[in-house]
Every structure is written in C-alpha cells, then in structure tokens.
C-alpha cells in the first residue's frame, strides 16, 4: 500500500472544494492510503510517512498561500537528514493563471534533500 499526503490551504472555500475532490478520487484506489490535512495541521511526521504528496493552494498575489509557505518553513530544514525526494502534484485555485504559485512550490519542493 502507498501513502499519499494531501496538504492544502483554503480561505474562501475554492481550494478546499478542489482538495476534497482530489481526496475523493484518491480514496477510491484500493492500494492508496491517504492523509488529508490543512497546511497548518501538517508536519514533518506526515511528510516522512508519505510516499507521494499533493499540494493545494490558492494563488495569493502571484504566490502560494502563507499557510502552505508556513508548512515549508516548518519542515524544510528538519527534513534534511531524511533524504526526502518524493513525487508530488500541485493544484492551484486562481483568478489568474496560477503559474507564480506553481513555480515557487516547485522551487521549494525540488530543494528538499
């Protein structure tokens, strides 16, 4: 069985709706166990548990949400000794094209050791 971590932040509900749809779809797979967490609730232990991660965020001022950035701030350096290099996906709720948020999430996630 594979472990999938879904981490998201939503202020207005749009990203939460998307996250719930992703979670429903992933939960239908028999060989996938999911953890579905708001960004403020996720931590290093969740990251270490995961075989793959899906990040969800609204695009705020061309960037990811502060809550998702907080998750990265809390886990990036503590993750260093664990050699985390997981497959990941990103979804963005956006009034623009969302590329700013995707670009910055990519930059951070690819930097995990």
Question: Each predicted region: which residue ranges?
Answer:
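N-terminal beta1-alpha1 ligand-phosphate binding loop
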Residues: 2-26
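Short linear motifs at secondary-structure transitions and domain/linker junctions
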Residues: 10-13, 27-32, 63-68
């Amino acid at each position: 069985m594979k472990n999938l971590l879904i981490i998201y932040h939503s202020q207005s509900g749009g990203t939460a709706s998307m996250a719930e749809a992703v979670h429903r779809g992933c939960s239908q797979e028999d060989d996938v166990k999911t953890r579905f967490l708001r960004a403020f609730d996720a931590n290093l232990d969740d990251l270490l548990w995961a075989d793959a991660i899906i990040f969800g965020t609204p695009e705020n001022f061309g960037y990811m949400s502060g809550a998702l950035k907080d998750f990265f701030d809390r886990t990036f350096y503590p993750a260093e000794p664990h050699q985390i290099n997981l497959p990941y996906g990103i979804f963005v709720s956006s009034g623009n094209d969302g590329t700013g948020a995707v670009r910055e999430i990519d930059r951070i996630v690819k930097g995990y050791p």
